[in-house]
Amino acid sequence: MNQILNAQRLIQLSQFHPKLKNIWYLVAAATFSVCNEPQEIPKLYHYAMLLSNDNAHMYRFTLASQTIDLLRSELPMRKTLINENYQQPTFFQKQLTAKFREVILKTGPLAGLPRAINGLTMLKETTPDILVPHLDPIDPWEAAMGNSSPLSETSMRRKHDKTIQERDHTIQNGLRHWNSIYNKVSTRVVNNLNSSYPDLWYYTLVHVYGPLFAFDEILSAQETSLVIIASLVPQDVNPQLRGHLKGALNIGCDKETVEAVRGLAILISQWCGVSWKSGVVKL
């Protein structure tokens, strides 16, 4: 499998722009996932985990090299080393792990479920065992007969809507999030989707914006907005990217941060061999 990130590039990403100090790794993870380079995600994850330690900024190059060496080791030894490094993960490291998962999940409807599956699988294989949820196996055959649950509800971060009222609440959250992003053009964009195919708007609202994009218990609304921009940059979809660049401003991101996210996603896309038909739209 092609290897794109080395120690020097990890440092380059981490120092790309001061405004991205606490989100560069999430922006990068989304971009690599969309570019179908999931093998790079563990490097971002472990480098960000190591940088969270006290005084880590003083040893950026050493930690970047350690990250590359760790993930280059053979699988049994690699897993042992990972578990030894994180016997007592900090609150921030637990939070960081959850954010990486959430970022990749949110790329699913933007770039395709298969790529999100590949990214989350690669992340799981290099996550310390202590930070991997311990779940009872799901039996889809029994669940299809109504004899067991098809969901690990106690471990899910999202609440499973069991009543009409709960479903309506999720949809309303999705609409509020949508209106915050699209603002003055919200009505026009909704009716453009609806007139293209009513089921397109239904899917967008009920299955994407409601339960996924509006969910802010792991990523903030601003973080989600920036991750969406990073996910759109490699795909040569300027109409959608233009809307989300403006939407990020509407939802509270400052212009310099939005432009930095766009720039970082372009750099990573170029590393991945992406080309664009007519350039990448900007604010």
Swiss-Prot record:
Peroxisomal targeting signal 1 (PTS1) is a tripeptide located at the C-terminus of more than 95% of all peroxisomal matrix proteins. The prototypical PTS1 is the terminal tripeptide SKL (serine-lysine-leucine) but the consensus of PTS1 is defined as [S/A/H/C/E/P/Q/V] [K/R/H/Q] [L/F]. However, this description of the PTS1 consensus must probably be expanded beyond the terminal tripeptide. Keywords: Cytoplasm, Peroxisome. It comes from the Eukaryota. It is found in: Peroxisome matrix; Cytoplasm, Cytosol. InterPro entries: AhpD-like, CMD-like, PTS1_Protein. Disruption phenotype: Impairs growth on oleate as well as on the non-fermentable carbon sources ethanol and acetate. Leads to increased level in threonine, serine, valine, isoleucine and histidine; as well as a reduction in citrulline, tyrosine and phenylalanine. Present with 1890 molecules/cell in log phase SD medium. GO terms for molecular function: peroxiredoxin activity. A motif (Peroxisomal target signal 1 (PTS1)) lies at residues 281-283. This is Peroxisomal protein 2. Probably involved in peroxisome formation or maintenance as well as in amino acid metabolism. One of its GO terms (cellular component) is peroxisomal matrix. Belongs to the PXP2 family. PANTHER family: CONSERVED MITOCHONDRIAL PROTEIN-RELATED, PEROXISOMAL PROTEIN 2. Its main location: other.
